[in-house]
Swiss-Prot record:
Contains 2 disulfide bonds that can be either 'C1-C3, C2-C4' or 'C1-C4, C2-C3', since these disulfide connectivities have been observed for conotoxins with cysteine framework V (for examples, see AC P0DQQ7 and AC P81755). Expressed by the venom duct. Keywords: Disulfide bond, Ion channel impairing toxin, Secreted, Toxin. It is found in: Secreted. The cysteine framework is V (CC-CC). One of its GO terms (molecular function) is ion channel regulator activity. GO terms for cellular component: extracellular region. This is Conotoxin Ama1251. It comes from the Eukaryota. Probable toxin that inhibits ion channels.
Length: 11
């Protein structure tokens, strides 16, 4: 899945 925290996202 994808995670987004503040200005950075990881998929």
């Amino acid at each position: 899945d994808s995670c987004c925290i503040e200005q950075h996202c990881c998929d």
